[in-house]
């Protein structure tokens, strides 16, 4: 571990801080009541919460602007799986090394440290953990994943999510799903049977959802012909209906190909903004599309889910508990 002393001091001792779930002393901050403003938000203000924008500070990996008129603060997303990619932070060993430890408690402590450094650097959601399996030996991102066994990966993913979420930071499960090679990843079509999908590729994501992950990030690839960001069966039937996921789904960065198709399939947030490869929706036509192609109903679902995540995050000052 390459540990930064200043980061360690600012984030505090990982084991000395109370978990968010059991901390009854924290006063609710501004974000704790953000959902109350939903009824006052205009359709335009709601729409701006569902598409990323550049971070004014230039520090966040992803940024949702909030609504200043209603006192709704922005959400800041930061990479990554091996340590916060901003400011003074710790460079942790690769996730595959964590997998080799066979130690869920170590994974929880890792997640807790990652979450605390996320908060200490002024961010809300960390883009971790990676929950894909190691299936292709030449995959360039195998180091981000816990291993090749679905049960083992599920245990470590759940523990990491528990650690992150316990600090008040949000965890992001990625990349949903079957993103197991990097070559041609934005065009690749993964053909996988239902049994293999359930037994191999989904367990780690299911474990992370059951543990309370705030965000799920879709993969670049197609699954059975449909892009993961436009896959209604995965986003709605599996994630929402079967698993009961109540957080927010986001695309991988520039991972959408059709804004309307993604939104109607169940994707909540397009990151980091309008994709350069997507079929774009001009602002002048967006309101029309919202009403004409069923996006108003999707907007009514996505925005409350956004608030649910906002309300789970702590401390208006951006500091950990």
Give a label for each model feature.
Residues 1-321:
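Glycoside hydrolase catalytic-domain context in secreted enzymes
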């Amino acid at each position: 571990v390459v540990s930064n002393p200043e980061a360690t001091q600012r984030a505090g001792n990982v084991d000395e801080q109370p978990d968010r779930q059991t901390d009854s002393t924290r006063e609710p901050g501004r974000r704790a009541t953000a959902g109350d403003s939903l009824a006052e938000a205009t359709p335009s203000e709601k729409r701006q919460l569902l598409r990323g924008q550049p971070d004014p500070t230039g520090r966040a990996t992803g940024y949702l602007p909030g609504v200043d008129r209603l006192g709704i603060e922005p959400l800041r997303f930061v990479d990554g799986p091996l340590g916060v990619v901003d400011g003074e932070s710790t460079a942790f060993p690769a996730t595959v090394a964590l997998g080799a430890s066979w130690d869920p408690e170590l994974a929880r402590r890792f997640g807790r440290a990652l979450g605390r450094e996320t908060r200490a650097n002024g961010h809300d959601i960390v883009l971790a953990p990676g929950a894909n399996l190691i299936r292709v030996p030449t995959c360039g991102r195998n180091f981000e994943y816990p291993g090749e066994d679905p049960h083992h990966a599920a245990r470590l993913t759940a523990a990491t999510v528990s650690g992150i979420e316990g600090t008040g930071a949000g965890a992001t499960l990625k990349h949903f799903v079957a993103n197991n090679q990097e070559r041609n990843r934005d065009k690749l079509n993964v053909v996988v049977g239902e049994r293999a999908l359930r037994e191999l590729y989904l367990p780690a994501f299911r474990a992370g959802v059951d543990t309370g992950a705030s965000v799920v990030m879709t993969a670049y690839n197609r699954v059975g012909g449909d892009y993961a960001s436009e896959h209604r069966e995965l986003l709605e039937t599996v994630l929402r209906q079967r698993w009961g996921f109540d957080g927010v789904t986001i695309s991988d960065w520039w991972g959408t190909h059709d804004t309307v198709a993604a939104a109607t399939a169940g994707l909540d947030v397009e990151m980091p903004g309008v994709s350069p490869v997507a079929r774009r929706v001009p602002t002048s036509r967006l309101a029309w599309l919202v009403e004409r192609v069923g996006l108003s109903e999707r907007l009514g679902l996505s925005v409350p889910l956004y608030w649910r995540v906002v309300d789970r995050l702590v401390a208006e000052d951006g500091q950990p508990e």
